[in-house]
Amino acid sequence: MVLDEIVRHKKKEVEEKKRIKPVEELINEIKGGYSGNFKKVLQKEGISIIGEIKKASPSKGIIKEDFDSVKIAKVYEKVDVDAISVLTEKEFFKGDDNYIREVKKVSSKPILRKDFIVDEYQIYESKILGADAVLLIVSVLGDKLRDFYNLSKSVGLDVLVEIHDRQQLEIALEAGCDIIGINNRDLKTFNVDINTTENLIKYIPQNTTIVSESGIKTPEDIRYLASLGVDAVLIGETFMKIIDDIDKISDFVKEAKGGG
């Protein structure tokens, strides 16, 4: 199973990082409080769009050959994307922690660190890198979710909590999570079904901010999700395929938001 392999590899990677820089050193480097910028842009009127910076994935392999995180961030800065998701997972998604720092230099958009967080160390690290929010995946963390969620909040990060089924949703709601990401991709099989959002959204309280992730390919998909009550969408592969054509991506965003 790909997810198990990713988690095993990530745990080893974090242990290596701890040997190089102990968690105590990391905590001492933390500066700045809570900005709330990520949550704010998701809650504004109309549907919000999170554009992802992603070179590869286990299911698709290399998505963007001539990958340049700064160039992509500059495109997102120019079009009406509301936040940026930065993939930092190295082994399976060809990401890098430094992409967050690079993007932060050229973009004013709030940044979500997208990785497989398995250790509290990564939460402190995310804050130091300059992320405004982190992704916590219920299928990875299970009953550790509440502690990881509370720690993230305590260091000044918003938290996108990812679920894929009803059981995971209940865990997220019991932990008091205020931003729920419905992943239309099953991380066990990597199969995608955009109807996952429709099937689960009815169980989510109205005061929760809802993000739909994966399998979103057209402006029509986004308008459909908005009609269900989704507050934001996260788009990776679809944008990576057209990122070199700023007019095309700008038109896509305008049409998705109802202005095209």
Swiss-Prot record:
MF GO annotations: indole-3-glycerol-phosphate synthase activity; phosphoribosylanthranilate isomerase activity
Pathway linked to the protein: Amino-acid biosynthesis; L-tryptophan biosynthesis; L-tryptophan from chorismate: step 4/5
Top-level division of the source organism's lineage: Bacteria
UniProt cross-references to CDD domains, sorted A to Z: IGPS
Cited PROSITE patterns: IGPS (PS00614)
EC number(s) from the headed UniProt entry: 4.1.1.48
One Gene Ontology term from the biological process aspect of the record: L-tryptophan biosynthetic process
EC class of the enzyme, as a word: lyase
Coiled coil: none
Keywords (A to Z) from UniProt: Amino-acid biosynthesis, Aromatic amino acid biosynthesis, Decarboxylase, Lyase, Tryptophan biosynthesis
Keyword Cell membrane included in the entry's annotation: no
InterPro entries in the cross-refs: Aldolase_TIM (IPR013785), Indole-3-glycerol_P_synth (IPR045186), Indole-3-glycerol_P_synth_dom (IPR013798), Indole-3-GlycerolPSynthase_CS (IPR001468), RibuloseP-bd_barrel (IPR011060)
Disulfide bonds: none
Catalysed reactions listed for this entry: 1-(2-carboxyphenylamino)-1-deoxy-D-ribulose 5-phosphate + H(+) = (1S,2R)-1-C-(indol-3-yl)glycerol 3-phosphate + CO2 + H2O
Family to which the UniProt record says this protein belongs: Belongs to the TrpC family.
NCBIfam families assigned: PRK00278.2-4
Annotated protein name in UniProt: Indole-3-glycerol phosphate synthase
Lineage summary: Bacteria, Bacillati, Bacillota, Clostridia, Thermoanaerobacterales
Gene: trpC
